[in-house]
Amino acid sequence: MRRPPSAFWTLLLYLAAFSTLSYAAAAGIVLQGDAGPGKGKHIVLVSGDEEYRSEQALPQLAKILATRQGFKCTVLFAINRKDGTIDPDQRDNIPGLEALDSADLMIIFTRFRDLPDEQMKHVVDYVESGRPIGAMRTATHAFDLKTSQTYQQYSWNSKVWDGGFGRQVLGETWIDHHGHHGKQSTRGIIAKGQENHPILRGIQNGEIWGPADVYEVRLPLPGDSQPLILGQVLDGMRPTDPPAAGKQNDPMMPVAWVKSYTGKQGHTARIFTTTMGAAQDLQNEGLRRLIVNACFWALGMEDKIPARTNVDLVGEYQPLPFKFGGFSKGIKPSDLLMR
């Protein structure tokens, strides 16, 4: 008679199975995904901001994309050069960006990064390849390249390439806070005429909400930009708070839009940008659905967007409030696989 497996061997078998789905890469984490419409596609998510906890938001987003939709996801982080921990204050180091060489979609959520040429080259090559981009919150001011001049035009305040990567590729650079930061939150209102856009499938008007405030943008947005969601400034930090009176909501600022970008080599890419996306914002199901739907759209897979995309949270998700210096210290990418 066979003896039942011990708890040790049961655990070992479980870990072996789990390791085929997710593992720690040299500088990030890789989630292989499972069956689903995204199977066979590779999304690289690049984090690195000091305030809005992209290091928490993007791993959760990757888990949703991999577990619920079948995408392979690689998540990269700002890494402390001395101890290998995730450190958003390390502005000059996001190792592993060579993963972009095989990516089908880049999702970027960085702020004022000053990356060395050998890392930045992978970003620039990706942007010029015509492959799609999804951008969140501070990605409008993703780079502040001071150490090297090679790719300085990508800086948020570039005069050579007006507004840099943010303005030229995504549609806007950093302008200002439009809502009162930390005191006024954001409700998402569907832009007139966009009700049937595939990215908005399954999203109700006013359903999207987040505690991070509305960013100011210049109107109209450039080129072929199409606003999808307008940010209604709320007088308070709860989704039930009333709209702010006065000029803040007249007009409302776009907080999510789509556009195209054609690079120097003539390749044209689909671009989705949202100035929402703080880690706490992703607790809102409507915003998660917006971003996941946008991934399908960016990849030219809008026919795969169902009536109500499954964007249920995966595992534990307790995001920290947005603030400078508020990240969890001592965490390595491999630690995130156990959460």
Residue locations for each model-derived region?
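N-terminal secretory signal peptides that target proteins for export/translocation
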Residues: M1-F8
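Catalytic beta-strand/loop cores that center a nucleophilic Ser/Cys/Thr
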Residues: G28, A66, K72, R91, ...
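Extracellular ligand-binding/catalytic regions of CAZymes and related secreted enzymes
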Residues: A26-G38, Q56-A57, T67-R68, D235-R339
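A glycine-rich, often tryptophan-bearing local segment used as a flexible ligand/cofactor-contacting loop or short
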Residues: I108, R113-G202
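Nucleotide donor/acceptor-binding cores
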Residues: K41
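Helical hinge/lid and interdomain linker segments adjacent to catalytic or ligand-binding clefts
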Residues: G28-A35, V44-F143
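Bacterial N-terminal signal peptides
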Residues: W9-Y23
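Active-site-proximal beta-strand elements of phosphoester/diester hydrolases
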Residues: S47, L228-L230, F272-M276
